[in-house]
């Protein structure tokens, strides 16, 4: 935070307010845990690939209870890589013994979905739960 403030001293109050309330930036939707649990009960493995910074992760993980339901997670701060660069998708696959051609990657950013496609994954740009369910069915994912 000090580095941010030193780069923008006129915004110190705003920077401090933002970081003190960072946990409010993460929201868990009601469908998240049941959706993950349904996928897993039908034999699908579920992983998280996130561009979260360490500080953000520490201050939002309590809000994101679905983290305990996934098979694994890879956060940018752990590997110093970011979506949509190919290395982070490759690291995800290597860490969890995944084959890109067997993965369907969901992300709310089209650029990140395109990054997944570039390494051989199928991808869905997430807009709504219902749209994602429809697109998953088009990829022959049923649960």
Which residues does each predicted region cover?
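Glycine-centered secondary-structure boundary/capping sites
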Residues: 5, 24, 31, 80-81, ...
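Short, acidic loop-to-helix structural element flanking the phosphoryl-transfer center
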Residues: 9-47, 86
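Asp-based, Mg2+/Mn2+-dependent phosphohydrolase catalytic module
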Residues: 53-54, 58-143
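Short acidic/histidine-centered micro-motifs embedded in hydrophobic/aromatic stretches
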Residues: 3, 18-22, 55
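Helix-loop "lid/cap" segments that line or gate small-molecule binding pockets
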Residues: 1-10
């Amino acid at each position: 935070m000090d580095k941010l403030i030193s780069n923008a001293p006129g915004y110190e109050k705003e920077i401090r307010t933002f970081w003190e309330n960072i946990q409010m930036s993460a929201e868990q939707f009601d469908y998240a845990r049941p959706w993950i649990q349904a996928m897993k009960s039908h034999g699908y493995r579920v992983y998280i690939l996130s561009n979260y910074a360490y500080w953000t992760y520490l201050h939002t993980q309590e809000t994101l209870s679905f983290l305990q339901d996934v098979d694994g997670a890879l956060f940018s701060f752990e590997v110093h890589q970011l979506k949509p660069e190919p290395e982070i998708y490759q690291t995800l696959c290597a860490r969890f013994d995944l084959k890109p051609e067997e993965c369907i990657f969901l992300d709310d950013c089209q650029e990140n979905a395109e990054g997944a496609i570039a390494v051989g994954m199928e991808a869905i740009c997430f807009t709504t739960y219902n749209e994602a369910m429809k697109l998953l069915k088009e990829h022959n994912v049923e649960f």
